[in-house]
C-alpha cells in the first residue's frame, strides 16, 4: 500500500475494504446494553447509505457536527461525511451547553449528528436558534419533536434500500481539501478550530504505518477508548484501516480493564494520565509482595531497565532476564489480554521513570509527540530502538528544526491548513511555512531523536529570572502514591508553591504530604524547591472544567479558581 497514491481518506478506506473478507467483523462496541457489530460489508453499505442521505443537505465544504461517544457509528459517520464532500467537525461529549453554542456558531454546521437524546439536550437550544442547521440525525433514541427542523434516525437510514446508481462512489476531495475541523480543547481561552487536510492525515499515516507494522504478525486488534473527537485517536482510526485491524470500542472508562480482557488488543493508545494511574496501581500491588515474589519483581525491574537502556549484561544476567520474561512479564501482559505488543503514549509528556518502569516489567511503551495542528503526530519511538526520555525520530515527511530560543518548529504536508475563521492566530503560529509548536526541545545530533523539555507557555520564570520547568517537578509529585494531582505556581515570584490533590487515603494528611515534598525538594535546585503547599479536596476533572478531555490540567482555570489561596502564600 502506497499512501502517497491516495487523494483522500475515503479512497483509502474503500481500497482496504475491497481487500478484506466482507464477512469479517470490522467494528464492535463492547456495550453490555447496546452491543453492536459491523462486518466490513455492513460498514461499507452503511457509509454509502448515510452519504447518500447527507447529500440532500450538504454541499462541498459544508460542515457536519458529530457529537457522540466512541462507537462503530462514529467511524461510519466520519467516512460518510467525507464521502459527501463535507467536513467532519467532531466535538467532545463532555462539552457544556455554552461550549456547543460556541462551536456551532463558529463553524455553522449544515447538519448535526448526535448519539442520543441525552446528548441532544445540551445542543437543542442552539440548534433551534440557528437556521443554517437543516437536519439533525440521531444514532438511537430519537424522540418525536414539534419543530421545523428535519430529524432523522440513523437506523432507518442504513436499513433503506439504495440503488447502485445512487451510490456516491467517489468524492472530489484532493489531498489539499479539508477533511475535518478539530477544536483544540486547549488549556486556556476559547477553543480554536484546526483545519486538517486529507493529505495531512494521509502523510501522518505513512509514519504511523512504520511504527505499527513491526508489531503485527497477524490481523491486529485495537481497543479504542480515548475520545475520537481528539486528533490523536481520530488519526488512529485511519491507522486501524491501513493495517486492516479489528476495532473494539470500549464501553466506558470504568469498564476499561474488563474491556481490555475481552478485546485482547495488540496495540493500545493512551495519554500520560492513563500510564501514571497504571504505574501507581502496579506499584502499590508490587509493594505488597513479600519473599520470593518481591525478589522476582525487583529483579524484573532491574534487568528490564538494563536491557532498555542497552547496558551491558553478562551471560548469567541475560539468562535471568529471559527467565523473568516467563515468570513475571508474561503474567503482567496477561492482565492486558495477553496479546499486547505495545502501548503508544501521546497527547502529553510521559514521565521518564514511568516509561522505564512499564518497559522494564514487560509493557513496551512507545512515546510519541504531536499536536492537533500537525495531524497530529510529529515523531514516535520505534519498537526497535526505544529511547525513553525522547519522543523518537520525526515521521517521514515531517521536517523538524529547533529555533534559537529552543522552540520546536515543524514543516510538512501534515501541518494544518489553518485555524477556522481565525487568520490572525494562524499567522501567529505558521510563519514561512513553519509551524511554531510552542514546545521547547532539542534534537540528538547522533540519531535525530527529538526530546521535549517543556511547554513554552508553561515555563515559570522566577522573580530572579530563572526558567523553571513545572512539568518536571509535577511529575515527581504525581509519581508518589499519596498524590493524585498537582499544579505548581510561582511565575515572577520569589519561590514556588503547589496545589496538591491527595489520593483518597491521604486526604487532609498534611504531615505525610509535607514529608513527600521535603524528600522531592532534596533533589531540586534552590529555585525549583517548593516552599509552601495547599491541599485541596476537590479533584481536577473534565466535569468541573479543570482538565482537558485528554486529562491535562487547565492551568489558567485552576489558577483562577485558587488565585486567592495561591497569592496569600506570598503575603505571609
Regions found by a protein language model. Name each.
Residues 37-41, 179-205:
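Conserved AMP-binding A3 loop
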Residues 120-175, 282-329:
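ANL superfamily adenylate-forming
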Residues 112-114, 402, 412, 417-418, ...:
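AMP-binding/adenylate-forming catalytic core of the ANL superfamily
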Residues 26-58, 62-75, 79, 96-101, ...:
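Conserved AMP-binding/adenylate-forming core of the ANL superfamily
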Residues 83-156, 504:
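Structural core segment of the AMP-binding/adenylate-forming
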Residues 23-25, 161-183, 190, 215-221:
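Conserved pre-ATP/AMP-binding loop-to-beta segment of ANL
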Residues 268, 324-450, 456-459, 473-474, ...:
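Conserved AMP-binding/adenylate-forming
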Residues 202-221, 228-329, 339:
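Conserved AMP-binding/adenylation subdomain of ANL enzymes
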Amino acid at each position: 500500500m502506497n499512501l502517497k497514491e491516495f487523494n483522500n481518506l475515503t479512497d483509502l478506506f474503500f481500497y482496504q475494504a475491497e481487500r478484506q473478507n466482507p464477512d469479517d467483523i470490522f467494528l464492535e462496541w463492547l456495550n453490555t446494553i447496546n452491543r453492536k457489530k459491523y462486518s466490513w460489508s455492513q460498514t461499507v453499505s452503511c457509509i454509502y447509505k448515510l452519504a447518500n442521505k447527507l447529500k440532500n443537505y450538504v454541499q462541498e465544504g459544508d460542515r457536519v457536527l458529530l457529537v457522540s461517544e466512541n462507537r462503530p457509528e462514529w467511524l461510519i459517520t466520519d467516512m460518510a461525511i467525507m464521502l459527501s464532500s463535507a467536513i467532519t467537525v467532531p466535538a467532545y461529549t463532555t462539552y457544556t451547553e455554552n461550549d456547543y453554542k460556541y462551536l456551532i456558531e463558529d463553524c455553522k454546521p449544515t447538519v448535526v449528528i448526535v448519539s442520543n437524546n441525552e446528548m441532544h439536550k445540551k445542543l437543542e437550544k442552539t440548534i433551534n436558534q440557528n437556521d443554517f442547521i437543516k437536519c439533525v440525525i440521531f444514532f438511537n433514541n430519537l424522540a418525536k419533536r414539534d419543530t421545523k427542523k428535519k430529524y432523522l434516525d440513523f437506523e432507518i437510514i442504513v436499513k433503506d434500500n439504495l440503488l447502485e446508481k445512487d451510490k456516491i462512489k467517489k468524492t472530489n476531495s484532493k489531498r489539499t481539501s479539508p477533511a475535518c475541523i478539530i477544536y483544540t480543547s486547549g488549556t486556556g481561552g476559547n477553543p480554536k478550530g484546526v483545519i486538517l487536510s486529507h493529505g495531512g492525515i494521509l502523510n501522518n499515516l505513512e509514519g504511523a504505518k512504520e511504527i505499527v507494522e513491526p508489531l503485527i504478525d497477524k490481523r491486529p486488534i485495537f481497543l479504542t477508548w480515548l475520545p475520537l473527537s481528539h486528533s490523536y485517536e481520530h488519526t488512529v482510526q485511519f491507522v486501524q484501516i491501513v493495517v486492516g485491524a479489528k476495532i473494539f470500542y470500549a464501553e466506558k472508562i470504568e469498564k476499561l480493564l474488563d474491556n481490555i480482557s475481552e478485546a485482547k488488543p495488540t496495540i493500545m493508545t493512551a495519554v500520560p494520565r492513563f500510564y501514571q494511574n497504571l504505574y501507581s496501581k502496579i506499584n502499590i500491588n508490587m509493594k505488597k509482595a513479600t519473599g520470593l515474589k518481591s525478589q522476582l519483581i525487583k529483579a524484573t525491574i532491574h534487568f528490564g531497565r538494563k536491557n532498555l537502556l542497552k547496558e551491558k549484561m553478562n551471560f548469567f544476567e541475560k539468562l535471568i532476564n529471559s527467565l523473568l520474561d516467563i515468570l513475571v512479564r508474561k503474567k503482567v501482559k496477561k492482565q492486558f489480554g495477553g496479546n499486547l505488543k505495545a502501548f503508544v503514549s501521546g497527547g502529553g509528556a510521559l514521565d521518564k521513570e514511568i516509561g522505564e518502569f512499564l518497559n522494564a516489567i514487560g509493557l513496551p511503551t512507545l512515546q510519541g509527540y504531536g499536536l492537533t495542528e500537525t495531524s497530529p503526530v510529529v515523531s514516535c519511538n520505534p519498537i526497535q530502538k526505544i529511547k525513553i526520555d525522547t519522543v523518537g525520530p520525526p515521521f517521514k515527511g515531517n521536517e523538524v528544526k529547533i529555533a534559537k530560543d529552543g522552540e520546536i518548529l515543524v514543516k510538512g504536508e501534515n501541518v494544518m491548513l489553518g485555524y477556522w475563521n481565525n487568520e490572525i492566530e494562524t499567522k501567529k503560529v505558521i510563519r514561512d511555512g513553519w509551524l511554531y509548536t510552542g514546545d521547547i526541545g532539542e534534537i540528538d545530533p547522533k540519531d535525530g531523536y527529538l526530546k521535549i523539555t517543556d511547554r513554552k507557555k508553561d515555563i515559570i520564570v522566577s522573580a530572579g529570572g530563572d526558567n523553571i520547568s513545572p512539568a518536571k517537578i509535577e511529575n515527581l509529585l504525581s509519581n508518589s502514591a499519596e498524590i493524585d494531582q498537582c499544579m505548581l505556581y510561582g511565575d515572577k515570584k520569589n519561590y514556588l508553591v503547589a496545589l496538591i490533590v491527595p489520593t483518597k487515603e491521604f486526604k487532609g494528611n498534611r504531615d505525610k504530604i509535607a514529608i513527600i515534598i521535603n524528600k522531592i525538594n532534596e533533589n531540586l535546585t534552590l529555585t525549583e524547591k517548593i516552599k509552601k503547599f495547599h491541599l485541596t479536596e476537590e479533584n481536577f476533572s473534565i466535569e468541573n472544567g479543570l482538565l482537558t478531555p485528554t486529562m491535562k490540567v487547565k492551568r489558567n482555570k485552576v489558577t483562577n479558581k485558587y488565585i486567592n489561596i495561591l497569592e496569600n502564600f506570598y503575603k505571609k
